[in-house]
Regions:
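Extended basic (Lys/Arg/His-rich) segments that typically form rRNA-contacting surfaces
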Residues: 1-259
Length: 259
């Protein structure tokens, strides 16, 4: 697992590039994390750090958690997250982790809980086509059809796509592009949509699967380079048209007229 940050989904907007390119973005407010614990191989069998995010009143904590934060001499934190690291010597208790973590990153993985849709049928939940509208079908147009087997095995296998609770599950969207980040206001702008509703908590991490993809910023530069070439061609066209306009117009019937 790579190190990450916990943030809040503010909403969606769009960003305009210099070339006029419009990009849909999701705005995420990042909370700076504080390293609460440092675990080494001698203690745990692996190197890891425990990071606390968000503030919470001590009155909302139980006695065990109150004692834990008093022992660590730090403010109570709402979320505690553990990340495994390879170079444990770089991290110390009390250090803060912020948006600087993604300074050199182009893509990130974002994990959050999807919006709950309640109990849903197979057509909405699993995109089933349903049964026929007529020709012998009655009161089962949106049903899932048969679910069982024969006498052997005589049961429905686990994982069978059926009607049930839809949404309200943690999902990870991989390789979302970072459009820009605002270090002063702790905001990060990510291309595309992120699971969950407004004000829902999200976990942002460095992308696990490294990909080669043209980013929107690179595309913007290419469009700008093309726009710099095309005005010169347009200038040449305008010059030719202006020269034609300057030529005196021939009067009708002037051919073959003797003076």
């Amino acid at each position: 697992m790579t190190i990450g940050l916990i943030g809040k989904k503010i909403g969606m907007s769009r960003e305009f590039m210099d070339s006029g390119l419009s990009i849909p973005v999701t705005i995420l407010a990042i909370e700076k994390g504080r390293i609460i614990n440092v675990f080494t191989k001698e203690k745990r069998g692996y190197d890891a750090i425990q990071v606390g995010f968000g503030k919470i009143k001590s009155s909302k904590l139980n006695k065990q958690m109150k004692g834990f934060f008093v022992k660590k001499s730090t403010e109570p934190r709402k979320f505690l997250k553990e990340f495994r690291v390879s170079n444990i010597s770089e991290y110390k208790e009390g250090n803060e982790i912020g948006l600087e973590l993604f300074k050199d990153e182009k893509f990130v993985d974002i994990k959050s809980k999807t919006i709950g849709k309640g109990f849903a049928g197979v057509m909405k939940r699993h995109n089933f086509s349903g049964l026929r509208a007529s020709h012998g079908v009655s009161v089962s147009h949106r049903s899932g059809g048969s679910t069982g087997q024969n006498q052997d095995p005589g049961k429905v296998f686990k994982g069978k796509k059926m009607a049930g609770h839809m949404g309200n599950k943690f999902r990870t969207i991989q390789n979302l592009e970072i459009i820009k980040s605002d270090l002063e206001n702790n905001l990060i702008f990510v291309k595309g949509s992120v699971p969950g509703s407004k004000n829902s908590m999200v976990l942002i991490q460095k992308n696990v699967k490294k990909i080669k993809r043209i980013t929107s910023l690179e595309k913007n530069k290419k469009i700008q380079a093309l726009n710099l070439v095309t005005p010169e061609k347009n200038k040449m066209k305008t010059k030719k048209t202006s020269e034609k306009k300057d030529e005196p117009a021939k009067q009708p019937g002037s051919k073959g007229v003797k003076k």
